[in-house]
Amino acid sequence: RSIAGGLYKLQLVETDLPCICDNEILVKVAASSLNYHDLLVALGSIPTEDKRVLLGDASGEVVEIGDSVSKWNVGDQIMSVCFPKWVEGRPKREYLSFIGDNEDGYATEYIVLPETAVTKTPKGWSPVEVATLPCAGLTAWRALVEEGNLKAGETVLIQGTGGVSIFALQLAKSMGAKVV
């Protein structure tokens, strides 16, 4: 858990296995990834509640489902989504709740989530690969495809060496763009 005071105040805490409600799933976390956003939360640069469980990206397995859950079965492989309350369209402030920021995150063995807070993992990806996709991969996709409207044959400048840049490089190349 994060504690006011930054990285040197992080704590490992033992807790009981969480209980779920009717519309929730219990996920055993297989892998999680650290993004720049997570670092900012841990450093206190992004204000959050004291004792927040960090990390917003993960992969895992559904190990229990609530009575009214219809989308998932025990054993399903899932990955996190950056903004679980934002389904489509332009983001609105009320949809921008971020797991690991305004809600407890994936730096845990088990997490309880609404059934709508996750999506299926891509086929052929390992749990570790999947855990890198939600924030960095989708940020790169949004920048290049949704906002940038990148087409084959166009040239794109990709700056940086972090997760978003690496995904942007791979996406641009796979789309037939020239990367500088």
Specify the residue positions occupied by each region the protein language model found.
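Glycine-rich beta-strand-centered segment in the early N-terminal region that forms part
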Residues: 16-32, 42-87, 102, 122-125
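A short, glycine- and basic residue-enriched loop/turn
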Residues: 37-39, 147
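Mid-domain Rossmann-like dinucleotide-binding core that forms the NAD(H)/NADP(H) cofactor-binding site
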Residues: 78, 125-180
